[in-house]
Amino acid sequence: MAPEISIVIPLHDEEDNVEPLVQELTGVMRSVGRPYEVILIDDGSADATFATLRRLQAADSHLRVIQFERNFGQTAAFAAGFAHAQGALIVTLDGDLQNDPADIPRLLDVVRTHDIVCGWRRHRQDAFLTRHVPSVAANWLLGLVSGIRLHDNGCSLKVFRAAVVKPLKLAPGMHRYLPALASQLGNRVAEVVVNHRPRRSGRSKYGLSRTIGVLRDIIGLRGLMRRAIDPATDASRLYTVKQILEAGAERCR
């Protein structure tokens, strides 16, 4: 049966988090009771993330694994997941267990009357000065530039209608601005408070340099939006796939 829901998860050096994440997702999606797939993108991990994914995928036909040639970044991983997603709805979340899969059913309920539903980490469980404060500033600036006021554009836990995101051509870093772009194109965007958990294992990939990059991107947002919907934009070099693991097949690229 073709999946109705595609769950897209970028992973970079998350060897200790990926198995418990898949276990949580499996329980949640069984309770949802709709056909689904989980697309896990190994974004050039240097640890045992891919080996763990290979083992998990061999035992679960819901899992599809995409391995990149090297680390291309989160936007590239999301873009690959969107390109391979078969469901009419696409759920995105981080692979570090800070997003709570138990929130997915509530977002799926809200998307019945919207095109994108964004998670809002009202009570963030990470560093106040280096993560929370820059996030507040970036969300304020993005609202000023784009006209859409969301509390938490950076939360990866979102649900999209596939018809909204599949046609878009993403530039590096652009995954954060999909709600703003979708709103500009006339789509309905909602925001739902979600749980945010402390990181259990591994280390955060975010730092000051990424915050500066986000602020720079927001200032140039209108240009990014034009590129995303321009038929002449070539997004084919955003990432290179090394291999794909899925039920009954292992393909090298």
Question: What does each model-found stretch correspond to?
Answer:
Residues 17-19, 47-56:
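Acidic helix N-cap motif at the loop->helix transition within catalytic regions
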Residues 42-51, 97-98:
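A conserved acidic beta->alpha catalytic loop
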Residues 1-3, 173-253:
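Hydrophobic helical membrane-anchoring modules
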Residues 68-85, 106:
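Glycine-rich, basic loop-to-helix element that forms the pyrophosphate-binding segment
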Residues 1-27, 34:
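N-proximal low-complexity "stem/linker" segments adjacent to membrane-targeting elements
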Residues 34-44, 66-68:
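Short beta-strand/loop segment that forms part of the nucleotide-sugar
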Residues 90:
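Short aromatic/hydrophobic "clamp" motif used to bind/position activated sugar donors
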Residues 105-129:
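Conserved donor NDP-sugar-binding/catalytic core segment of glycosyltransferases
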